[in-house]
Amino acid sequence: ARINSITVVVDNDSWNSTIGDKIRNLYADEYEGLPQIEERFTLKQMPYEAFSGFSRSSRNIIFINKKSNPEFFFEVDKYARPQIYLEIKGNSIKSILEQIDKSKKEAINKFTNGEIEESKRRILKSPLKDTKAMDDFLINMKMPSAYSLYKQDKNFIWYQKQIQKGHSNIIVTKLPSQKNIFDYNIQSLIKLRDSIGKSFLPGRNPESFMISEKEYLPYQKKVNYYGIKMLETRGTWEVKGDFMGGPFLNYLVEDKLNDRVLFIEGFVFAPSKRKRDNIIELEAIIKLSLIHISEPTRLQQ
């Protein structure tokens, strides 16, 4: 099944009225950091009578129970594995809408993390074997075998995968660790990105190179992932002096073990194509790789 999809089990009338509207507003809202609007989750409604047998095998399920006292609960691997099942109960439209609201934050978190885990699982099924460039860089990166080394020097590696009408990319460079990663705000991170773009990411035309798109301010947040401190930035890139652009997902990562900061970025070029699932794969690659720097780092703390 497609990444970031949810099966919603509810009767057709409810789906086409306020209950369906509420679920769509909360779960099919805009996925942050993409150049075109794409929904956060792809929703597929299924009436109760169709919810049996193989149709219960979706990884993510929201089941609306209209005949019980108001509450919500989660079950893991209820009908299949892996699976996150959310049951929302109520005995009136109002009480069901309230429970949808109450469960939203936890549910989005669980579904999002579950899909990153699923993406990691897919990566590990067929990982890239040639990792010499990463070994030289002291980084244990896991990525699908469809990626190949595109460019490398002593401070920079660039992997690329061809996709329909474009390519998906991961770059890694090292920064000295004098500066705390959380001292970077959006403006100083953009400045850093643009200088790295000028040094390492040329466009197709002479004197052209990748920069952050000026029209849209990126989203930024602090992340603690398995004990690793990271600054996450999502936004869109363009090429100065050329007509190219797309989404990026950037992490500044504290690598205490090697006394450095890693600048790791995934970016996608695929004009007029949907890019949400490509960005989710890049996030999974980066997070899967970072778990491997966390183990020795944690031991040292």
Residue ranges and their predicted role:
Residues 5, 9-13, 18, 144-204, ...:
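Secretory pathway targeting signatures of secreted, lumenal, and periplasmic proteins
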Residues 83-92, 169-174, 260-271:
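Short, well-ordered beta-strand elements
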Residues 1-2, 16, 25, 123-151, ...:
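N-terminal "mature-domain start" segment
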Residues 1-37:
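N-terminal mature-domain "stem" immediately C-terminal to a signal peptide or N-terminal signal-anchor/transmembrane
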Residues 92-98, 262-285:
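A short acidic/glycine-rich loop-to-helix N-cap element
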Residues 1-10, 16, 65-127:
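Solvent-exposed alpha-helical segments and adjacent loops
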Residues 39-42, 46-90, 198-259, 273:
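Signature of long, low-cysteine stretches enriched in small and polar/charged residues
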Residues 291-301:
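Single conserved hydrophobic/aromatic residue that forms the stacking wall/gate
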